[in-house]
Amino acid sequence: MFLEEYDVIVVGAGHAGSEAAAAAANLGSKTLLVTMSLQNIAQMSCNPAMGGIAKGQIVREIDALGGYSGIVSDRTAIQFKMLNKSKGPAMWSPRVQSDRMRFAEEWRMMLEGTPNLDFYQEMVKGLIIENGKIKGIRTSLGVEIRSKSVVLTNGTFLNGLIHIGEKQFGGGRAGESAATGITEDLVKAGFEAGRMKTGTPPRVDGRSLDYSKMNEEKGDAKPDKFSYSDLTKPLTQQRSCYMTYTSLNVHDILREGFDRSPMFNGRIKSLGPRYCPSIEDKINRFADKERHQLFVEPEGWNTCEVYVNGFSTSLPEDIQFKALRSVAGFENVKFFRPGYAIEYDYFPPTQLKHTLETKLVEGLYFAGQINGTTGYEEAASQGLMAGINAHLKVHEKAPLILKRDEAYIGVLIDDLITKGTEEPYRMFTSRAEYRTLLRQDNADFRLTPMSFEIGLASEDRMRRMEHKLNESEKMVAFFKETSVTVAETNPILIEKESAPISQGDKMFKVFSRPQIELEDMLKFEKVDSYIKENNLDEEIVEQAVIQVKYSGYIEKERNNADKLNRLEEVKIPENFDYNKIKSMSIEAKQKLSKIRPVTISQASRISGVSPSDISVLLIYMGR
């Protein structure tokens, strides 16, 4: 049935698996995507949205590298918002509300249109490992499929266990079976496994809600999009979301079910996402809060199904229903399906290399929730990098490893490999020490050249990026070269409560003042004329303005990154014996021996390794 060997087999067709398969196939590897259900490719198992704080930056990075998530998100969006717009550009984060059904449909169409990609529907029960190398997979029907590399992207399906009140049953997602066999094979091969938990809220009938009792949350008046390509356009119409609140009465009703809650009666022992707690966890941990926000999110253009964001729960369904009926606007709510919690297997990511290849088995890669992360975007980015690196290894090419100053994806993977995680890991802007460099507006500058070099990003993408870069640099040069007069400048400065100038000055210096915004710059006739004469779009103008207003911060961060990157150049031999260093702490020796950092810089980020330990290590490395 499968007569030839594949270059890459991807197991699981969620967000990680879809990106992994697309990347490997687009790069030229003969790729097979294996899933338990071809009808459920790229499902949005939880909220119908992509992006958000730090996550939006990741989606733009995926797009800049030639992945599909940004394009699919744009084509299936029903609302766009740029979050944190009141803060500096390092914090701006794009987010879309998505049409859940169209999202999965669009992903499948994109994958079916990808050359070199085959599909197969069946459960993978085991792995073929020979002499420490992956050789293929074994399915539930006993079919063996050979491959030079395998990417595991199993999501919440590995021995998944669903909880609703006192009921529990096996499943990887509501209505779908759990996957068995893979964990057992990996543990037998020497891998360490653990358990994690996540949850999802009930879905309800939007026709049964009274939106007049809620606050309307509209999308941006001038919506943007994720993809840097010309394959998508910004939305011309949008659907609103709504916001309402729980109350003390709602909390009292929820507490009635605590004795039947798997979270409180000991049935669930694994840790859930710290930054996305269940509603019962919120009212238990924050008992002083009189109310909690609930976001009422439509699931698409042509459905009345609604996602109740903020009400994730594993309480009994009767308690869920009774509590929701006490929420303003939900008095007559009708349930489509209850919320639930799910426990699943994961593998501590310190067992991986920065390529996402496992240290134990050559050619085997992990991506997504199997690594202990939570979120579509985190999963998709790992899948993309695993797919890229699986292809590069099979074809004996150098790996693509993103540094912490190059991408949020680099921060994510480095955190996982270097620090590990004992609870579902989600990305935040605060995790990135170089977030002024890693903005959502410049992901193409940072990453498209790398992707183009390995053959993933198209020539059209590269040309578009170069045009944007050249034109924005020309505009910055124009600001530096062009002077403004006292007469045209001071009225604007006084209006903005900024100190007036006593003589003419360069635009760059005036515009770098924090009080001056883009609309103030456009009041200068020379600026307005320059933009019109050069036919510059908003993206180019915004990029130039950011370079002017934040040049000091950007330069400082770049210098700091360059200093630390010097330590990235100091390599540590693969089998270095840390136990021979007598002046190093025992904890440092243990951590370094377990994680096996590749560079001094990575070693310095490991918890329990002190600056003095690094100094000793540098001496041993001859520095």
UniProtKB/Swiss-Prot annotation:
Gene3D superfamilies: FAD/NAD(P)-binding domain (3.50.50.60), GidA associated domain, C-terminal subdomain (1.10.150.570), tRNA uridine 5-carboxymethylaminomethyl modification enzyme MnmG/GidA (1.10.10.1800). SMART domains: GIDA_assoc_3. Keywords: Cytoplasm, FAD, Flavoprotein, NAD, tRNA processing. The keyword Cytoplasm applies. Pfam families: GIDA (PF01134), GIDA_C_1st (PF21680), SAM_GIDA_C (PF13932). Its cofactor is FAD. PROSITE patterns: GIDA_1, GIDA_2. One of its GO terms (biological process) is tRNA wobble uridine modification. FAD binds at G12, A13, G14, H15, A16, G17. It is found in: Cytoplasm. The keyword Transmembrane helix does not apply. InterPro entries: FAD/NAD-bd_sf, GIDA_C_N, MnmG, MnmG-rel, MnmG-rel_CS, MnmG_C, MnmG_C_subdom, MnmG_C_subdom_sf. GO terms for cellular component: cytosol. GO terms for molecular function: flavin adenine dinucleotide binding. NAD(+) binds at residues 272-286. NAD-binding protein involved in the addition of a carboxymethylaminomethyl (cmnm) group at the wobble position (U34) of certain tRNAs, forming tRNA-cmnm(5)s(2)U34. Belongs to the MnmG family. PANTHER family: GLUCOSE INHIBITED DIVISION PROTEIN A (PTHR11806), PROTEIN MTO1 HOMOLOG, MITOCHONDRIAL (PTHR11806:SF0). Homodimer. Heterotetramer of two MnmE and two MnmG subunits. This is tRNA uridine 5-carboxymethylaminomethyl modification enzyme MnmG.
